[in-house]
């Protein structure tokens, strides 16, 4: 039986916190294992599904305005190009984040789903196979998942997207309804309206950006 590999630290999650901590501990001479279940999430939310891709698309809408495109077919083609350009950008950044740690001798990166087998042992499941590693210290940097509201039929629909999945949609939606008038919902509403979608925003609150100060919300 293959001997279980031991580490000074195991970090579950290759996000902003995980990658920074891994680099810091490795710099102190510790042997580090970094576990990530998705090869699309090296570097975390900001790089892959948050700040950078959304701002790249927002910037694309400014280019669209400057080009003066008005026809729906022109806008649809431009939107598809914008999604492809966004994917190229985050792919490059994701690769840089991976190489930044993968090239360090005392960091091992495991692709797979990490779970606790015991207090100091992590089981990593990948492609039907399991590997177990042991760590003196274990850090959890798993982030969060999207919550789908409990509206009847919503989870079963093929036309429901999250803020993550809609940015993979290569065909511009003609009509788009956004549930939630917070800053994320409004960013997507503004962005897709600029691309050419007909957008409706729905929220239980009486005003936009209900979690923000009224002075800020009034400027939305």
Regions found by a protein language model. Give the residues of each.
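Rossmann-like NAD(P)H-binding beta-loop-alpha module
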Residues: 170-208, 212
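Beta1/beta-strand and adjacent pyrophosphate-binding region of the FAD-binding site
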Residues: 3-15, 172-182
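Glycine-rich flavin
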Residues: 4-7, 24-30, 36-172, 205-209, ...
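N-terminal Rossmann-like FAD-binding beta1-loop-alpha1 element of flavoenzymes
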Residues: 8-34, 185-194
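Hydrophobic residues in beta-strands of the RecA-like P-loop NTPase core, especially within AAA+ ATPase
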Residues: 12, 35, 141, 178-179, ...
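Residues that cap or flank secondary-structure elements
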Residues: 13, 89-90, 180, 212
């Amino acid at each position: 039986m293959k001997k279980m590999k031991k580490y000074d630290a195991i970090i579950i999650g290759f996000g902003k916190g995980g990658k920074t901590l891994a680099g810091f501990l490795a710099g102190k001479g510790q042997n580090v294992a970094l576990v990530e279940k998705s090869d699309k999430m090296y570097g975390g939310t900001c790089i892959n599904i948050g700040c950078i891709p959304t701002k790249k698309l927002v910037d694309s809408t400014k280019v669209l305005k400057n080009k003066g495109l008005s026809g729906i077919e022109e806008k649809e083609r431009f939107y598809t190009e914008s999604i492809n350009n966004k994917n190229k950008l985050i792919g490059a950044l994701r690769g840089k984040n991976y190489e930044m740690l993968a090239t360090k001798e005392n960091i091992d990166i495991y692709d797979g789903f990490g779970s606790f087998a015991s207090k100091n042992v992590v089981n990593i499941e990948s492609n039907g196979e399991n590997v177990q590693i042991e760590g003196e210290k274990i850090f959890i940097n798993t982030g969060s998942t999207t919550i789908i509201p409990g509206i009847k039929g919503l989870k079963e629909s093929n036309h429901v997207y999250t803020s993550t999945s809609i940015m993979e949609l290569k065909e511009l939606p003609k009509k788009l309804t956004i549930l939630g008038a917070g800053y994320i919902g409004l960013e997507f509403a503004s962005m897709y309206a600029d691309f050419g979608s007909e957008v409706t925003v729905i929220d239980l609150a009486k005003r936009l950006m209900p979690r923000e100060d009224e002075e800020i919300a009034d400027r939305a």
